[in-house]
């Protein structure tokens, strides 16, 4: 079990949770030869005046896990595919396949997808590849959709289900979705613009990784199961401990691993372009009530509205989880990720900007979308301490 309070007290972004747990589990392994020599680590120019974007993403958490099921609404067959917490990008391809398997539409038939974020786009593309004629209806499209503000790393069990609801049946479905998505992402490596790539990831700590960091305090957020460690650990190489001479960071404890990373700007553009080249159409449309589904021409609708399903369907099982990210000016040689345990800092060296993330104690249950620039500037200042200037 991953204790949420312990994890936030340790101030590591939940996107790094699997990497962190592997670090805790492998405290003693020091890998002098486990990795080929890496290029020198380019320092990050961490200054607040280099911030180019600060935005908020609302993660749609459901204690029971994603809602992937069918019901009849307004004379339509509606397939729900929402509520993926912090795992939307990671599980999107497998979730799309699971959702569409519930209706098995015939090739050539028409299908509507409501929503143009991570889940909506991948569901639409998956349906096209099944031979369907697909139209997306959405209020927003990338880069305005909420999921465009995500961290951009492989995190398939991030806030995907509460520990109490992680049944054997759920875990089988989750594993199938995760493995399907992972295979799909490997087919997207090496494309122009590098929408998907593997990054070296460094996990840093002031104390041994086996030593818990407990900041105390109470939270209404549940604990989460360690699904990635238990069910798909074969998809990742283990992280290794680094000796002080093997890294430049001013910390006594460091580990290095590999992490699948999404350059969301390029990746979202790829998805939209592929969808439209295959004959798909994106229609700007706002739905205020599911009764409006009746006006659509398509007999089958996939509801991929994410957090929007809470208002659209009145689904109170969806809990908002606020997530703020900021981006620094891109640096061409910064293609690594950093997680500084105990300092509320996660960094992803994306090509569309060096992403800097910090968490707040009140993120769970918080649907506020206004950015807090001061919080991001403070995170950038903490990042700067990892690259002390010598001049």
Region roles according to the model:
Residues 299-305:
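Short hydrophobic core segments
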Residues 141-177, 234:
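Glycine-rich active-site loop/strand segments that organize a redox cofactor
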Residues 281-294:
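A conserved short coil-to-beta-strand element within the FAD-binding core of flavoproteins
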